[in-house]
Amino acid sequence: NTYHQGEVFYSVISELNDVLAQHESKEDLEGIVDTIAFLREQFEHAHKAVERVGFTSLPTNIVHGDWHPGNTLYKDGEIIAVIDFDSLRLSPRITDIANGALQFSMRMGSPEDVENWPDSFRGHTIQSMVQAYDQFTKLPMMASERTIFPSLMIEAMIVESVIPIHKTGSFGVVRGSTFLRMIERKLNWFLPRVERVIEVIQPPKRDEDSFA
């Protein structure tokens, strides 16, 4: 299972407003119906874009499935280990790369101040992760994988937020409606930059001097 699951997502998000209503007041949920509709719409657009390239035909590997900074150990500012392999599975490799790029590039803050998290992402982090993958793999990312890279980031951003909120009404210690509105803000920042993401993750041209 991956975050690229249309049927599961549509079933869950159709119940999301009712779930939130069990945990939050009407005042807190003002406008949340529009937020949920926006998230559903953006997932649908992204999902269709991914399906158009033939998702199930993409190169498959064993993937971590839950790659984010919290599952990474550091020493002296360097990554020394990746942990938590509970979600290990066989899946199109691009799902892990795109989700990792999302998780490591997202600008965040304290859980008590989600309303003020920056909308933006670290573009250089996205670029560096793809370049590093290409450098150390026997099969660099295909053109079709690069084309859907931001669409998968969008899917992951939405699904990895909606699913846990549907289960408990919150995202960890953060109120569900607050977290969903933050995702909406980040999507509104990210969407106009989709083509730019595709551009920066392209492989360098042969003999190109990257510092020219």
Residue ranges and their predicted role:
Residues 1-64, 75:
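ATP-dependent phospho-/nucleotidyl transfer catalytic cores
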Residues 3, 7-10, 14-23, 159-212:
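ATP/Mg2+ or Mg2+-diphosphate-binding catalytic cores
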Residues 40, 44, 123-130, 184-191:
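Hydrophobic core segments within long, regular secondary-structure runs in both alpha-
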Residues 47-95, 209-212:
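Active-site acidic catalytic loop and adjacent metal/ATP-binding pocket
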Residues 51-56, 138-144:
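Surface-exposed helix-capping loop/turn segments at secondary-structure junctions
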Residues 59, 64, 68-69, 115-131, ...:
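An acidic intrinsically disordered interaction segment
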Residues 94-138, 154-172:
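Active-site activation/catalytic loop segments of kinase-like enzymes and analogous catalytic loops
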Residues 141-153:
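All-alpha amphipathic helical-bundle segments outside canonical DNA-binding/catalytic cores
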